[in-house]
Amino acid sequence: GHADYVQTNDGKWYSVLLGSRPSEPFEKKHFNTGRETYLVPMNWDGDWPIMNPGFKEVQYSYSLPLKPYIPKGYIPQSGNFTYKDEFNNKLNNNWIFLRTPKFSWYSLSQKKGFLSLKLRPETCSEKVNPSFIARRQQHIFSNATIKMKFYPRNHNEKAGLIIFQNEDHFYYLCKSIMDGKNVIQLYKSSNGNDQSKMHILDFYEIKKNEINKDVFLKIESKGNIYSFSFSFDNKKWSILKDSVDATFLSTETAGGF
């Protein structure tokens, strides 16, 4: 929808429009990447525009009569790409918050090469501004990994990696305390129910020789499922839980655009 038409210097026509990429089975209309911007070929049948001629569905790529424009320092925003942030400078514009912070609760100068976040009582289950910095999921098949230093003191202190659609639809992979022991936990939001708006799906009790180590957390998206893993050396990975329902975060289930 919302199509604009563009004619190039050689007389060819293209359209810029919005669309979505559902995971299989396509008829279920489950997609976790939101509405996206597409550039598709078009032509005219009299005064009637014909989008994507020759195809029923929009294709993943087309040949364009243009040379790629890649300025110095360009960070890819579409297609297949890898992005890594060492947090050595100011916060990149690709990172987003949940609502506008009223004060600074993060720092890139407290420890060089680290993004330091303050522990605060606000959570992602509430319509507030929690200690949350994220990027949008841009791929159906992808993974996101963080390296983290965190030493919780009680069960209310948690930090980790979250995949979030809204306050009632998210999965949270974190390090915390449970029954007095250090653990890696996976939570699922409770879809508007009580139980503090999330419940535990699985956990791993951290061994004594692992407690003071950095922890690596990873979420892999594989179409309509997610996989949640952890490591203490970024080499040997353990799956905490696999084949987790990703459609729970889809627009069809959780709402939104």
Segments (PLM) and residue ranges:
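Carbohydrate-active catalytic/glycan-binding domains of CAZyme proteins
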Residues: 1-257
